[in-house]
């Protein structure tokens, strides 16, 4: 079993979880092919982490299965947006932590 972690990525964890659920339990090669044609930013980021997990184990992509793809919430980046009459509104930009584990197919 090998794993890869990407932390503090500027990405909404809610949107990333939608992609992560789709590839869990899939063959890594199929998952990478599927992620390549998804139009989301999260798909591109998760594809890189999956490829890294496969490479960390020294495996070939067609011989491993994604056992777990977990997305956790990171800290929010706090920003301010100027508003009318000298006021300001707080903007919260979410970050995410991505954990991917792959295991050799048996």
Curated annotation (Swiss-Prot):
Any Pfam family hit: Ribosomal_L22
Record key words, sorted: Ribonucleoprotein, Ribosomal protein, RNA-binding, rRNA-binding
Presence of keyword Transmembrane helix: no
Cross-referenced CDD domains: Ribosomal_L22
Disulfide-bond pairs as recorded: none
Gene Ontology CC annotation, any one: cytosolic large ribosomal subunit
A GO molecular function held by the record: rRNA binding
Alphabetized InterPro entries for the sequence: Ribosomal_uL22, Ribosomal_uL22_bac/chlpt-type, Ribosomal_uL22_bac/org-type, Ribosomal_uL22_sf
Top-level taxon: Bacteria
UniProt-listed GO biological process terms: translation
Quaternary structure note: Part of the 50S ribosomal subunit.
Function: This protein binds specifically to 23S rRNA; its binding is stimulated by other ribosomal proteins, e.g. L4, L17, and L20. It is important during the early stages of 50S assembly. It makes multiple contacts with different domains of the 23S rRNA in the assembled 50S subunit and ribosome.
Protein's recorded name: Large ribosomal subunit protein uL22
Species the sequence originates in: Nautilia profundicola (strain ATCC BAA-1463 / DSM 18972 / AmH)
Organism ancestry: Bacteria, Pseudomonadati, Campylobacterota, Epsilonproteobacteria, Nautiliales
Gene name, Swiss-Prot/TrEMBL: rplV
């Amino acid at each position: 079993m090998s794993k890869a972690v990407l932390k503090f990525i500027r990405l909404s964890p809610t949107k990333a979880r939608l992609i992560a659920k789709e590839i869990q339990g899939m063959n890594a090669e199929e998952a990478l092919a599927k992620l390549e044609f998804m139009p989301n930013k999260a798909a591109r980021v998760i594809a890189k982490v999956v490829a890294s997990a496969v490479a960390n184990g020294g495996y070939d992509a067609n011989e491993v299965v994604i056992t777990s793809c977990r997305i956790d919430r990171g800290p929010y980046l706090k920003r301010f947006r100027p508003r009318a009459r000298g006021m300001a509104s707080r903007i919260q930009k979410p970050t995410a932590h991505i954990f991917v584990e792959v295991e050799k197919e048996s």
